[in-house]
């Protein structure tokens, strides 16, 4: 199924992503994910990347908040706090383990502060519109929970069902065969 057919189907039968109460950081987490995963893409690419996050929030196999989905991955304690045995748990610092997160930008060791403030603000406004149901959000991925760039072939891809290709990403869901 091509993108035009999916968008048309979505307009006819809009898939509503349930976002009853929006936690404070949810729009920021979604905007950061759009920024680092699809900022140079058009609306379809931004919606597709966002749909994967929101589909995961609504799937019991993943964390149930936007930020927990975006930040999902193993963590380790900082060497600075690990050396102090009597330090309270609230004062300990934890960081994601490099290159082991669900979304690579979150644990690539680089700053997560967007350089292009104007673009980030546009994406933050879009994510707020999505989260607060101010715009009609169509899941153009047909329920995808996974994606990767089209220039890589991860081992997990052959165990999933491909749903669509949008710009430079390929989207998948659990294999239902």
Regions found by a protein language model. Name each.
Residues 1-9:
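Sec-dependent signal peptide recognition
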Residues 8, 14-177:
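Bacterial extracytoplasmic/cell-wall-associated proteins, especially those involved in peptidoglycan
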């Amino acid at each position: 199924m091509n993108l035009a057919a999916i968008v048309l189907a979505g307009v006819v039968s809009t898939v509503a992503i349930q976002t009853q109460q929006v936690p404070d950081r949810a729009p920021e987490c979604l905007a950061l994910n759009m920024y680092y995963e699809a900022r140079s893409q058009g609306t379809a690419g931004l919606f597709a990347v966002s749909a994967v996050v929101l589909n995961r929030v609504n799937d019991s196999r993943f964390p149930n908040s936007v930020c927990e989905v975006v930040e999902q991955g193993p963590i380790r304690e900082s060497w600075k706090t690990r050396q102090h045995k009597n330090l309270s748990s609230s004062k300990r610092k934890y960081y994601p383990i490099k290159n082991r997160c669900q979304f690579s930008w979150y644990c690539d060791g680089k700053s997560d502060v967007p350089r292009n403030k104007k673009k980030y603000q546009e994406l933050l406004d879009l994510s707020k519109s999505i989260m607060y149901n101010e715009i009609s959000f169509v899941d153009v991925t047909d329920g995808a929970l996974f994606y990767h760039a089209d220039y890589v072939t991860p081992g997990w891809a052959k165990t999933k069902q491909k749903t669509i290709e949008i710009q430079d990403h390929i989207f998948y869901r659990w294999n239902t065969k």
